[in-house]
């Protein structure tokens, strides 16, 4: 049998789950009295931890990985050390596929957990120049394909001689930092490269325990109309230590497309 959990998050951010993050009991007591009890009880009854118990436990644990930093008003430095040890002691008892199946756990957190679960800072960075991708390879699995991180398009403005395109690209900071972000524009047999201006978005930084794991890079690109003649294909890429990474996960924000005069541009 399979099960899934549906949680309705409140936009006001005052749900029981959000409130729990400001209480010591959610970090230590819950792990001690529920998580480890469930794991130990399963091993005692069945000799091993069934998948459904692991999934239930991991679903509960994933919220702890979404806390950017634990305030000292909630846990003392000593208590935080105890909590982190307990957290990973629990995760080490969860099978890899259960962790990777979590829908609400980000790609960077999944790789971060694996890099510690397998061995501290483990995982070998691999590049595939043919598919223009990179990932971290472990003895029995791979995680964090760079091409699958989210690319957002927020606006497109028609100017007199150019198109101004704006968006944001998510970067996992375990990869080498981008040397540049660029558009690859292909029309027929002709390809142009357009460099983007980019900077980190301070409002979209993803952390765990104070460590910065990923960021969104806000970018702008100016594309001359002369690059468009017939069917034109635009790819969003970045330079990762001399290797090209091409994004495959495109998300149009609600602001995109924008009306310009009597025209509206649509991204196919």
Task: Briefly describe each language-model feature range.
Residues 22-25, 48, 52-55, 150-157:
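Short, solvent-exposed segments of well-ordered alpha helices
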Residues 5, 36, 58-59, 85:
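Active-site-proximal helix/loop capping residues that flank conserved catalytic or ligand/cofactor
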Residues 30-44, 80-93:
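Amphipathic alpha-helices of TPR/Sel1-like and other helical repeat/solenoid scaffolds
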Residues 50-63, 107-108:
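Amphipathic alpha-helical protein-interaction segments enriched in hydrophobic
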Residues 2-34, 48, 67-80:
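Nucleotide-sugar-dependent glycosyltransferase catalytic core
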Residues 33-55, 67-73, 175-177:
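Conserved, well-structured beta-alpha core segment at the onset of a catalytic domain
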Residues 57, 68-75, 83-268:
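Basic, ligand-binding patches in group-transfer machinery
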């Amino acid at each position: 049998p399979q099960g899934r959990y549906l949680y309705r998050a409140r936009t006001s951010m005052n749900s029981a789950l959000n409130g729990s993050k400001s209480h010591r009991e959610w970090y230590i007591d819950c792990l001690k009295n529920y998580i480890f009890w469930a794991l130990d009880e399963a091993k005692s009854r069945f000799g091993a931890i069934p998948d459904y118990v692991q999934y239930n436990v991991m679903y509960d644990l994933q919220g702890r990985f979404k806390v950017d930093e634990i305030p000292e008003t909630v846990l003392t430095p000593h208590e935080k050390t105890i909590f982190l040890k307990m957290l990973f002691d629990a995760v080490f008892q969860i099978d890899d596929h259960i962790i990777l199946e979590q829908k609400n756990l980000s790609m960077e957190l999944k790789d971060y957990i694996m890099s510690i679960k397998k061995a501290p800072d483990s995982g070998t960075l691999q590049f595939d120049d043919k598919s223009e991708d990179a990932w971290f390879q472990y003895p029995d699995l791979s995680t964090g394909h760079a091409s699958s991180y989210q690319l957002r398009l927020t606006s497109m403005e028609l100017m007199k001689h150019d198109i101004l395109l704006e968006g944001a690209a998510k970067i996992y900071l375990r990869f080498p930092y981008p040397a540049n972000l660029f558009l690859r524009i292909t029309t027929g047999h002709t390809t142009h490269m357009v460099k983007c201006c980019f900077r980190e978005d301070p409002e979209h930084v993803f952390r765990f325990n104070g460590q910065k794991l990923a960021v969104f890079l806000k970018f702008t690109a100016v594309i001359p109309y002369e690059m468009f003649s017939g069917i034109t294909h635009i790819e969003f890429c970045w330079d990762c230590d001399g290797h090209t990474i091409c994004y495959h996960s495109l998300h149009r924000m609600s602001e995109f497309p924008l009306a310009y005069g009597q025209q509206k541009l649509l991204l196919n």
